[in-house]
Protein backbone atom coordinates (compact mmCIF):
# COMPACT_ATOMS: atom_id res chain seq x y z
CA UNK A 1 0.00 0.00 0.00
CA UNK A 2 1.29 3.48 -0.84
CA UNK A 3 0.29 6.68 0.93
CA UNK A 4 0.57 10.10 -0.74
CA UNK A 5 1.91 12.84 1.55
CA UNK A 6 1.64 16.52 0.55
CA UNK A 7 5.06 18.13 -0.14
CA UNK A 8 4.56 20.81 2.51
CA UNK A 9 4.02 18.09 5.13
CA UNK A 10 7.13 16.22 4.00
CA UNK A 11 9.32 19.29 4.51
CA UNK A 12 7.92 19.83 8.00
CA UNK A 13 8.66 16.25 9.05
CA UNK A 14 12.41 16.82 8.96
CA UNK A 15 12.32 18.74 12.21
CA UNK A 16 10.10 16.24 14.02
CA UNK A 17 11.01 13.36 16.28
CA UNK A 18 8.38 10.77 15.45
CA UNK A 19 8.02 7.62 17.56
CA UNK A 20 5.31 5.06 16.97
CA UNK A 21 4.13 2.77 19.74
CA UNK A 22 2.15 -0.30 18.72
CA UNK A 23 0.11 -1.91 21.46
CA UNK A 24 -1.81 -5.11 21.24
CA UNK A 25 -2.43 -8.44 22.88
CA UNK A 26 0.38 -10.94 22.26
CA UNK A 27 2.59 -8.59 20.23
CA UNK A 28 6.36 -8.97 20.68
CA UNK A 29 9.01 -6.66 19.31
CA UNK A 30 10.71 -9.50 17.43
CA UNK A 31 8.44 -12.55 17.37
CA UNK A 32 10.82 -15.47 17.01
CA UNK A 33 13.54 -12.94 16.29
CA UNK A 34 17.09 -12.50 17.56
CA UNK A 35 17.46 -15.03 20.30
CA UNK A 36 13.69 -15.16 20.84
CA UNK A 37 14.63 -13.93 24.30
CA UNK A 38 11.23 -12.68 25.44
CA UNK A 39 9.61 -15.96 24.47
CA UNK A 40 12.31 -17.79 26.43
CA UNK A 41 11.82 -15.59 29.50
CA UNK A 42 8.10 -16.34 29.55
CA UNK A 43 8.84 -20.04 29.11
CA UNK A 44 11.20 -20.04 32.10
CA UNK A 45 8.60 -18.25 34.23
CA UNK A 46 6.08 -20.92 33.24
CA UNK A 47 8.53 -23.66 34.25
CA UNK A 48 9.06 -21.87 37.57
CA UNK A 49 5.30 -22.02 38.05
CA UNK A 50 5.09 -18.50 39.48
CA UNK A 51 3.40 -15.26 38.48
CA UNK A 52 5.75 -12.87 40.25
CA UNK A 53 9.41 -12.47 41.12
CA UNK A 54 12.53 -11.04 39.51
CA UNK A 55 14.93 -13.19 37.49
CA UNK A 56 18.44 -11.75 37.78
CA UNK A 57 21.24 -13.00 35.54
CA UNK A 58 24.89 -12.03 35.29
CA UNK A 59 26.56 -12.22 31.89
CA UNK A 60 30.15 -13.28 31.32
CA UNK A 61 32.58 -10.59 32.50
CA UNK A 62 35.76 -9.60 30.71
CA UNK A 63 38.59 -11.65 32.27
CA UNK A 64 42.31 -11.50 31.52
CA UNK A 65 44.58 -14.50 31.45
CA UNK A 66 46.48 -15.07 34.70
CA UNK A 67 49.51 -12.79 35.06
CA UNK A 68 48.67 -11.09 31.77
CA UNK A 69 47.04 -7.97 30.36
CA UNK A 70 45.49 -10.01 27.54
CA UNK A 71 41.80 -10.98 27.74
CA UNK A 72 40.64 -14.55 27.58
CA UNK A 73 38.48 -15.35 24.55
CA UNK A 74 34.94 -14.30 25.35
CA UNK A 75 32.21 -16.96 25.56
CA UNK A 76 28.83 -15.82 26.81
CA UNK A 77 27.20 -17.73 29.63
CA UNK A 78 24.55 -19.82 27.94
CA UNK A 79 21.78 -19.29 30.48
CA UNK A 80 22.29 -15.55 30.08
CA UNK A 81 22.22 -15.79 26.30
CA UNK A 82 19.02 -17.84 26.41
CA UNK A 83 17.16 -14.95 28.06
CA UNK A 84 18.92 -12.07 26.31
CA UNK A 85 20.28 -13.04 22.90
CA UNK A 86 23.20 -10.77 23.82
CA UNK A 87 26.63 -12.15 22.95
CA UNK A 88 28.41 -9.21 24.58
CA UNK A 89 30.62 -9.10 27.70
CA UNK A 90 29.88 -7.39 31.02
CA UNK A 91 26.09 -7.36 30.70
CA UNK A 92 23.29 -8.01 33.20
CA UNK A 93 19.63 -8.88 32.83
CA UNK A 94 16.43 -8.74 34.84
CA UNK A 95 13.01 -10.16 34.08
CA UNK A 96 10.10 -8.86 36.15
CA UNK A 97 7.70 -11.80 35.89
CA UNK A 98 4.61 -9.98 37.15
CA UNK A 99 5.03 -7.05 34.75
CA UNK A 100 6.46 -9.16 31.90
CA UNK A 101 9.38 -6.75 31.60
CA UNK A 102 12.73 -7.96 30.23
CA UNK A 103 15.58 -5.47 30.73
CA UNK A 104 19.16 -5.77 29.47
CA UNK A 105 21.91 -3.73 31.13
CA UNK A 106 24.97 -2.96 29.01
CA UNK A 107 28.32 -1.50 30.14
CA UNK A 108 28.57 2.23 30.68
CA UNK A 109 30.36 4.16 27.96
CA UNK A 110 34.14 3.89 28.28
CA UNK A 111 36.05 6.36 26.12
CA UNK A 112 39.39 4.58 26.54
CA UNK A 113 37.86 1.26 25.47
CA UNK A 114 36.08 2.85 22.53
CA UNK A 115 39.32 4.42 21.26
CA UNK A 116 41.30 1.20 21.55
CA UNK A 117 38.68 -1.42 20.69
CA UNK A 118 36.15 0.45 18.56
CA UNK A 119 32.58 1.61 19.22
CA UNK A 120 31.00 0.15 22.34
CA UNK A 121 27.46 -1.16 22.56
CA UNK A 122 24.94 1.64 23.12
CA UNK A 123 21.44 1.26 24.51
CA UNK A 124 19.92 2.31 21.17
CA UNK A 125 21.92 -0.31 19.27
CA UNK A 126 21.10 -2.99 21.82
CA UNK A 127 17.38 -2.20 21.59
CA UNK A 128 17.56 -2.68 17.83
CA UNK A 129 19.53 -5.92 18.05
CA UNK A 130 18.05 -7.82 20.95
CA UNK A 131 14.59 -9.12 21.77
CA UNK A 132 14.20 -7.30 25.09
CA UNK A 133 11.71 -4.70 26.29
CA UNK A 134 14.22 -2.15 27.49
CA UNK A 135 17.98 -1.55 27.51
CA UNK A 136 19.71 0.54 30.16
CA UNK A 137 23.28 1.25 31.13
CA UNK A 138 24.88 -0.56 34.04
CA UNK A 139 24.78 2.62 36.13
CA UNK A 140 21.00 2.16 36.43
CA UNK A 141 21.11 -1.46 37.60
CA UNK A 142 21.44 -0.88 41.34
CA UNK A 143 18.67 1.71 41.59
CA UNK A 144 16.34 -0.35 39.37
CA UNK A 145 16.75 -3.46 41.53
CA UNK A 146 16.38 -1.43 44.71
CA UNK A 147 13.14 0.00 43.34
CA UNK A 148 11.81 -3.48 42.55
CA UNK A 149 12.89 -4.82 45.94
CA UNK A 150 11.11 -2.00 47.72
CA UNK A 151 7.86 -2.73 45.91
CA UNK A 152 7.75 -6.51 45.55
CA UNK A 153 10.51 -8.39 47.41
CA UNK A 154 8.47 -9.05 50.54
CA UNK A 155 6.04 -11.14 48.49
CA UNK A 156 8.27 -12.54 45.74
CA UNK A 157 11.95 -13.52 45.56
CA UNK A 158 14.81 -12.53 43.34
CA UNK A 159 15.62 -15.71 41.37
CA UNK A 160 19.31 -16.34 40.70
CA UNK A 161 21.23 -19.29 39.24
CA UNK A 162 23.97 -19.51 41.85
CA UNK A 163 24.49 -18.08 45.32
CA UNK A 164 27.66 -16.37 44.06
CA UNK A 165 25.60 -14.27 41.63
CA UNK A 166 23.51 -12.24 44.06
CA UNK A 167 22.93 -8.56 43.26
CA UNK A 168 25.78 -6.60 44.80
CA UNK A 169 24.38 -3.53 46.53
CA UNK A 170 23.49 -2.22 49.95
CA UNK A 171 20.28 -4.07 50.74
CA UNK A 172 20.69 -6.23 53.82
CA UNK A 173 17.67 -8.54 53.67
CA UNK A 174 17.08 -9.65 50.12
CA UNK A 175 14.56 -12.42 49.57
CA UNK A 176 16.71 -14.65 47.33
CA UNK A 177 15.88 -17.99 45.72
CA UNK A 178 18.96 -19.75 44.33
CA UNK A 179 17.43 -23.24 44.05
CA UNK A 180 14.59 -23.11 41.54
CA UNK A 181 15.82 -21.07 38.58
CA UNK A 182 18.46 -23.51 37.30
CA UNK A 183 16.12 -26.53 36.94
CA UNK A 184 13.43 -24.27 35.46
CA UNK A 185 15.84 -23.02 32.81
CA UNK A 186 17.05 -26.54 32.11
CA UNK A 187 13.45 -27.64 31.59
CA UNK A 188 12.83 -24.70 29.26
CA UNK A 189 15.97 -25.21 27.17
CA UNK A 190 15.53 -28.92 26.51
CA UNK A 191 12.77 -28.42 23.89
CA UNK A 192 13.86 -26.11 21.09
CA UNK A 193 11.69 -23.50 19.37
CA UNK A 194 11.73 -22.60 15.67
CA UNK A 195 14.42 -19.95 16.08
CA UNK A 196 16.74 -22.34 17.89
CA UNK A 197 16.20 -25.02 15.27
CA UNK A 198 17.14 -22.56 12.52
CA UNK A 199 20.40 -21.83 14.32
CA UNK A 200 21.23 -25.52 14.85
CA UNK A 201 20.39 -26.29 11.22
CA UNK A 202 22.70 -23.54 10.02
CA UNK A 203 25.50 -24.71 12.30
CA UNK A 204 25.08 -28.18 10.82
CA UNK A 205 25.07 -26.79 7.29
CA UNK A 206 28.44 -25.13 7.82
CA UNK A 207 29.83 -28.22 9.56
CA UNK A 208 28.66 -30.32 6.63
CA UNK A 209 30.51 -28.06 4.19
CA UNK A 210 33.68 -28.30 6.29
CA UNK A 211 33.52 -32.10 6.58
CA UNK A 212 32.99 -32.32 2.82
CA UNK A 213 35.98 -30.07 2.15
CA UNK A 214 38.20 -32.30 4.30
CA UNK A 215 37.10 -35.37 2.35
CA UNK A 216 37.86 -33.64 -0.94
CA UNK A 217 41.37 -32.67 0.16
CA UNK A 218 42.37 -35.53 2.48
CA UNK A 219 44.59 -37.14 -0.17
CA UNK A 220 46.83 -34.06 -0.10
CA UNK A 221 47.32 -34.05 3.67
CA UNK A 222 50.18 -35.52 5.66
CA UNK A 223 49.35 -34.51 9.25
CA UNK A 224 46.32 -34.38 11.54
CA UNK A 225 46.93 -30.65 12.00
CA UNK A 226 46.09 -30.03 8.35
CA UNK A 227 42.70 -31.67 8.84
CA UNK A 228 41.96 -29.39 11.78
CA UNK A 229 43.22 -26.36 9.86
CA UNK A 230 41.09 -26.97 6.78
CA UNK A 231 37.99 -27.61 8.88
CA UNK A 232 38.52 -24.34 10.77
CA UNK A 233 39.26 -22.41 7.59
CA UNK A 234 36.05 -23.58 5.95
CA UNK A 235 33.92 -22.71 8.98
CA UNK A 236 35.42 -19.25 9.40
CA UNK A 237 35.08 -18.57 5.67
CA UNK A 238 31.35 -19.22 6.03
CA UNK A 239 30.95 -16.90 9.00
CA UNK A 240 31.29 -19.42 11.84
CA UNK A 241 34.30 -18.13 13.78
CA UNK A 242 33.72 -20.36 16.81
CA UNK A 243 33.72 -24.12 17.17
CA UNK A 244 31.18 -25.78 19.45
CA UNK A 245 34.02 -27.81 21.01
CA UNK A 246 37.66 -28.66 20.42
CA UNK A 247 38.22 -30.42 17.12
CA UNK A 248 39.09 -34.11 17.36
CA UNK A 249 41.11 -35.31 14.36
CA UNK A 250 42.53 -38.65 15.44
CA UNK A 251 44.23 -40.93 12.95
CA UNK A 252 45.07 -44.59 13.43
CA UNK A 253 45.29 -45.61 17.11
CA UNK A 254 44.50 -42.01 18.11
CA UNK A 255 40.94 -42.61 16.95
CA UNK A 256 40.51 -44.86 19.99
CA UNK A 257 40.99 -41.87 22.31
CA UNK A 258 37.50 -40.45 22.64
CA UNK A 259 38.54 -36.83 23.18
CA UNK A 260 41.88 -36.76 21.38
CA UNK A 261 42.63 -33.10 20.63
CA UNK A 262 46.41 -32.95 20.06
CA UNK A 263 45.85 -33.32 16.32
CA UNK A 264 49.57 -33.20 15.55
CA UNK A 265 50.66 -36.64 14.33
CA UNK A 266 51.58 -37.73 10.79
CA UNK A 267 49.02 -39.62 8.73
CA UNK A 268 51.53 -41.88 6.99
CA UNK A 269 50.87 -45.55 7.67
CA UNK A 270 47.47 -44.87 9.27
CA UNK A 271 44.23 -46.48 8.08
CA UNK A 272 41.40 -44.26 9.34
CA UNK A 273 40.70 -40.78 10.66
CA UNK A 274 37.98 -40.03 13.19
CA UNK A 275 37.01 -36.38 12.71
CA UNK A 276 34.67 -35.10 15.43
CA UNK A 277 34.09 -31.42 14.70
CA UNK A 278 31.14 -29.06 14.70
CA UNK A 279 30.69 -25.37 14.03
CA UNK A 280 28.79 -22.99 16.27
CA UNK A 281 26.29 -20.48 14.90
CA UNK A 282 24.89 -17.63 17.02
CA UNK A 283 25.98 -19.57 20.13
CA UNK A 284 24.14 -22.76 19.03
CA UNK A 285 26.15 -25.94 18.53
CA UNK A 286 26.39 -28.70 16.01
CA UNK A 287 28.06 -32.00 16.91
CA UNK A 288 29.20 -34.13 13.98
CA UNK A 289 31.58 -37.08 13.70
CA UNK A 290 32.75 -38.89 10.60
CA UNK A 291 35.28 -41.70 10.29
CA UNK A 292 36.87 -42.17 6.89
CA UNK A 293 39.78 -44.00 5.23
CA UNK A 294 43.03 -42.37 4.16
CA UNK A 295 42.62 -43.97 0.75
CA UNK A 296 40.09 -44.36 -2.04
CA UNK A 297 38.58 -47.37 -0.28
CA UNK A 298 38.77 -49.20 3.01
CA UNK A 299 42.44 -50.08 3.54
CA UNK A 300 41.63 -53.37 5.26
CA UNK A 301 38.75 -55.73 5.93
CA UNK A 302 39.14 -54.86 9.62
CA UNK A 303 38.44 -51.18 8.94
CA UNK A 304 35.52 -51.94 6.62
CA UNK A 305 33.91 -54.44 8.98
CA UNK A 306 34.05 -52.18 12.02
CA UNK A 307 32.65 -49.25 10.02
CA UNK A 308 29.74 -51.39 8.88
CA UNK A 309 28.96 -52.42 12.46
CA UNK A 310 28.86 -48.79 13.62
CA UNK A 311 26.90 -47.78 10.54
CA UNK A 312 24.23 -50.35 11.39
CA UNK A 313 24.20 -49.26 15.03
CA UNK A 314 23.49 -45.69 14.00
CA UNK A 315 20.95 -46.45 11.28
CA UNK A 316 18.90 -48.76 13.48
CA UNK A 317 18.86 -46.27 16.37
CA UNK A 318 17.99 -43.24 14.25
CA UNK A 319 15.05 -44.95 12.55
CA UNK A 320 13.46 -45.55 15.98
CA UNK A 321 13.57 -41.90 17.09
CA UNK A 322 10.12 -40.45 17.83
CA UNK A 323 8.24 -38.91 20.76
CA UNK A 324 7.72 -41.29 23.65
CA UNK A 325 10.85 -43.36 23.01
CA UNK A 326 13.12 -44.04 25.96
CA UNK A 327 16.68 -43.18 24.97
CA UNK A 328 18.04 -45.89 27.24
CA UNK A 329 16.37 -48.49 25.03
CA UNK A 330 18.28 -47.14 22.02
CA UNK A 331 21.52 -47.38 23.98
CA UNK A 332 20.77 -51.03 24.70
CA UNK A 333 19.91 -51.63 21.03
CA UNK A 334 23.23 -50.12 19.93
CA UNK A 335 25.13 -52.40 22.31
CA UNK A 336 23.23 -55.45 21.11
CA UNK A 337 24.12 -54.69 17.48
CA UNK A 338 27.75 -54.14 18.45
CA UNK A 339 27.85 -57.44 20.34
CA UNK A 340 26.50 -59.43 17.40
CA UNK A 341 28.91 -57.72 15.03
CA UNK A 342 31.93 -58.29 17.25
CA UNK A 343 30.96 -61.91 17.75
CA UNK A 344 30.95 -62.38 13.96
CA UNK A 345 34.44 -60.92 13.85
CA UNK A 346 35.58 -63.25 16.62
CA UNK A 347 36.41 -60.37 18.96
CA UNK A 348 33.70 -61.40 21.41
CA UNK A 349 33.28 -65.04 22.37
CA UNK A 350 30.02 -67.02 22.18
CA UNK A 351 27.33 -66.17 24.71
CA UNK A 352 23.91 -64.60 24.73
CA UNK A 353 23.72 -60.95 23.76
CA UNK A 354 22.08 -60.08 27.06
CA UNK A 355 24.65 -61.78 29.28
CA UNK A 356 27.51 -60.12 27.42
CA UNK A 357 25.82 -56.71 27.59
CA UNK A 358 24.98 -57.00 31.27
CA UNK A 359 28.53 -58.14 32.03
CA UNK A 360 29.88 -54.87 30.64
CA UNK A 361 32.05 -56.59 28.03
CA UNK A 362 30.62 -54.58 25.14
CA UNK A 363 31.37 -51.34 27.02
CA UNK A 364 35.08 -52.13 26.65
CA UNK A 365 34.57 -51.39 22.95
CA UNK A 366 31.67 -48.88 23.21
CA UNK A 367 32.43 -47.04 26.46
CA UNK A 368 30.33 -43.88 26.07
CA UNK A 369 26.69 -42.94 25.87
CA UNK A 370 24.78 -43.16 22.61
CA UNK A 371 24.05 -39.45 22.64
CA UNK A 372 23.02 -36.29 24.42
CA UNK A 373 21.01 -33.12 23.91
CA UNK A 374 22.39 -30.41 21.60
CA UNK A 375 21.62 -26.70 21.81
CA UNK A 376 23.41 -23.73 23.33
CA UNK A 377 25.88 -26.26 24.71
CA UNK A 378 27.20 -29.13 22.67
CA UNK A 379 26.26 -31.31 25.64
CA UNK A 380 23.10 -29.38 26.31
CA UNK A 381 21.16 -29.23 29.53
CA UNK A 382 17.99 -31.00 30.63
CA UNK A 383 16.17 -31.63 33.88
CA UNK A 384 17.47 -35.19 33.82
CA UNK A 385 19.96 -36.70 31.36
CA UNK A 386 18.32 -38.83 28.69
CA UNK A 387 20.62 -41.73 29.56
CA UNK A 388 19.60 -41.56 33.22
CA UNK A 389 23.10 -40.70 34.43
CA UNK A 390 24.33 -37.20 35.20
CA UNK A 391 27.68 -35.52 34.70
CA UNK A 392 29.26 -36.87 37.94
CA UNK A 393 28.81 -40.41 36.57
CA UNK A 394 29.93 -40.05 32.99
CA UNK A 395 29.30 -43.23 30.99
CA UNK A 396 32.87 -44.46 30.73
CA UNK A 397 32.80 -47.50 32.99
CA UNK A 398 32.17 -51.07 31.88
CA UNK A 399 29.16 -51.22 34.20
CA UNK A 400 27.52 -48.26 32.44
CA UNK A 401 24.77 -50.25 30.74
CA UNK A 402 23.50 -52.27 33.72
CA UNK A 403 23.73 -49.17 35.94
CA UNK A 404 21.60 -46.92 33.73
CA UNK A 405 18.37 -45.80 35.34
CA UNK A 406 15.12 -47.26 34.07
CA UNK A 407 13.44 -44.00 35.08
CA UNK A 408 14.58 -41.59 32.40
CA UNK A 409 12.70 -38.87 30.49
CA UNK A 410 11.08 -39.87 27.22
CA UNK A 411 11.95 -38.15 23.96
CA UNK A 412 9.69 -35.21 23.13
CA UNK A 413 8.93 -33.27 19.97
CA UNK A 414 11.41 -30.42 19.64
CA UNK A 415 14.33 -32.13 21.36
CA UNK A 416 17.61 -32.33 19.44
CA UNK A 417 19.79 -35.30 20.36
CA UNK A 418 22.91 -36.87 18.95
CA UNK A 419 23.10 -40.48 17.84
CA UNK A 420 26.80 -41.28 18.03
CA UNK A 421 27.63 -44.98 18.34
CA UNK A 422 31.23 -46.07 18.21
CA UNK A 423 33.43 -49.14 18.37
CA UNK A 424 36.99 -48.66 19.58
CA UNK A 425 40.07 -50.80 20.08
CA UNK A 426 42.04 -49.00 22.75
CA UNK A 427 45.31 -50.68 23.69
CA UNK A 428 45.00 -49.28 27.20
CA UNK A 429 41.37 -50.33 27.65
CA UNK A 430 42.07 -53.85 26.40
CA UNK A 431 45.08 -54.25 28.70
CA UNK A 432 43.06 -53.09 31.69
CA UNK A 433 40.07 -55.29 30.85
CA UNK A 434 42.18 -58.46 31.09
CA UNK A 435 41.89 -58.07 34.87
CA UNK A 436 38.10 -57.67 34.84
CA UNK A 437 35.43 -60.39 35.16
CA UNK A 438 34.07 -59.64 31.68
CA UNK A 439 37.42 -60.65 30.19
CA UNK A 440 35.98 -64.14 29.82
CA UNK A 441 33.89 -62.88 26.89
CA UNK A 442 36.76 -61.22 25.00
CA UNK A 443 39.10 -62.88 22.52
CA UNK A 444 42.11 -60.66 23.18
CA UNK A 445 44.29 -62.14 20.44
CA UNK A 446 41.65 -61.25 17.87
CA UNK A 447 40.81 -57.86 19.40
CA UNK A 448 44.44 -56.73 19.31
CA UNK A 449 44.50 -57.18 15.53
CA UNK A 450 42.14 -54.20 15.33
CA UNK A 451 44.27 -51.79 17.40
CA UNK A 452 45.84 -50.18 14.28
CA UNK A 453 42.44 -48.92 13.07
CA UNK A 454 41.84 -47.18 16.41
CA UNK A 455 38.11 -46.83 16.28
CA UNK A 456 35.04 -45.74 14.36
CA UNK A 457 32.41 -43.23 15.46
CA UNK A 458 29.55 -41.79 13.39
CA UNK A 459 27.48 -38.95 14.84
CA UNK A 460 24.47 -36.99 13.62
CA UNK A 461 22.19 -34.41 15.23
CA UNK A 462 18.58 -35.62 15.22
CA UNK A 463 15.46 -33.51 15.74
CA UNK A 464 12.52 -35.31 17.32
CA UNK A 465 9.45 -34.38 15.25
CA UNK A 466 5.75 -34.93 15.88
CA UNK A 467 5.73 -38.23 13.98
CA UNK A 468 9.37 -39.29 13.98
CA UNK A 469 12.64 -37.52 13.33
CA UNK A 470 14.60 -35.21 11.05
CA UNK A 471 18.34 -35.61 10.57
CA UNK A 472 19.81 -32.10 10.78
CA UNK A 473 23.32 -33.23 9.86
CA UNK A 474 24.37 -32.86 6.23
CA UNK A 475 27.97 -34.11 6.37
CA UNK A 476 28.55 -37.00 3.93
CA UNK A 477 28.96 -40.53 5.27
CA UNK A 478 28.97 -44.09 3.97
CA UNK A 479 29.14 -44.57 0.21
CA UNK A 480 28.74 -40.84 -0.49
CA UNK A 481 31.74 -40.15 1.72
CA UNK A 482 33.88 -42.69 -0.13
CA UNK A 483 32.85 -41.30 -3.51
CA UNK A 484 33.93 -37.79 -2.51
CA UNK A 485 37.35 -39.10 -1.43
CA UNK A 486 37.72 -40.93 -4.77
CA UNK A 487 36.76 -37.85 -6.79
CA UNK A 488 39.29 -35.81 -4.86
CA UNK A 489 42.04 -38.30 -5.68
CA UNK A 490 41.03 -38.46 -9.35
CA UNK A 491 41.07 -34.69 -9.70
From Swiss-Prot:
Q: Which GO terms describe its biological process?
A: proteolysis
One Gene Ontology molecular-function label: manganese ion binding
Which reactions are catalysed by this chain?
Answer: Release of any N-terminal amino acid, including proline, that is linked to proline, even from a dipeptide or tripeptide
Name the Pfam families on file: AMP_N, Peptidase_M24
- Cofactor binding mode and count: Binds 2 manganese ions per subunit.
Q: What is its EC number?
A: 3.4.11.9
The highest taxon in the source lineage is Eukaryota
Metal-binding as UniProt keyword: yes
Specify which residues bind Mn(2+) 2 according to the UniProt entry for this protein: 276, 287, 459
Cofactor(s) the protein needs: Mn(2+)
Locate the residues binding Mn(2+) 1. 287, 420, 459
> Keywords, A to Z?
Aminopeptidase, Hydrolase, Manganese, Metal-binding, Metalloprotease, Protease
Per its database record, what is this protein's job? Catalyzes the removal of a penultimate prolyl residue from the N-termini of peptides.
Give the similarity note: Belongs to the peptidase M24B family.
Query: Would you tell me the protein name for this molecule?
Result: Probable Xaa-Pro aminopeptidase An01g13040
